[in-house]
Amino acid sequence: IGNFNSESTYKPIDSDELKSILATTGRGYYIVAVLGAGQEPTNHALRDIAALGKDFDEWGRGIVLLFPNEEQYKKFRPQEFPGLPATITYGIDTDDSIRKEIVQAMNLNNSILPVFIIADTFNRVVFVSQGYTIGLGEQLMKVVHGL
């Protein structure tokens, strides 16, 4: 349904060095999201994913959850979402470049978060979701099981 460059870089929370999505997730499929910390659509999405945390862990692929900036990340409280998969890497979307790339490639509204995609390292996007989505965890899993 579109393209996303898996060589796009972000700043992992535990590092000052930029890292590519590909270097984080390895080859194959992965999930990338740009979140709005403390915003209800993002909280809802994270609760949906946490509810299926075991399924995502079994899938075993990388999930990269990005925040627009450090300030947003500091507002994030992972303990509010027990059950989030262990395969998550948190980071900062430096210069807003990843969100911009997804929004442009998928013709999405520029200002609405969260944005989730499932893509592969051949840069093919197979799923996209933006804003408030009921049952996002189930939708993601449905696509994952179809891969």
Predicted segments, located by residue:
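A short beta-strand-turn-helix
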Residues: 2-30, 37, 47-51
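Short acidic-hydrophobic, aromatic-tinged amphipathic segments that line or gate anion-handling sites
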Residues: 12-14, 87-98
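Extracellular/periplasmic catalytic domains that process cell-envelope and extracellular macromolecules
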Residues: 23-26, 57-58, 83-84, 108-111
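Structural microenvironment flanking redox-active thiols in thiol-disulfide oxidoreductases
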Residues: 30, 37-84, 97-103
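Hydrophobic beta-strand anchors of alpha/beta hydrolase catalytic cores
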Residues: 31-32, 116
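Active-site-proximal beta-strand/loop segments in catalytic clefts of secreted hydrolases
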Residues: 34-37, 66-69, 93-95, 120, ...
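Structural micro-motif
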Residues: 85-89, 104-117
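Thiol-/selenol-based redox modules, centered on thioredoxin-like
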Residues: 111-147
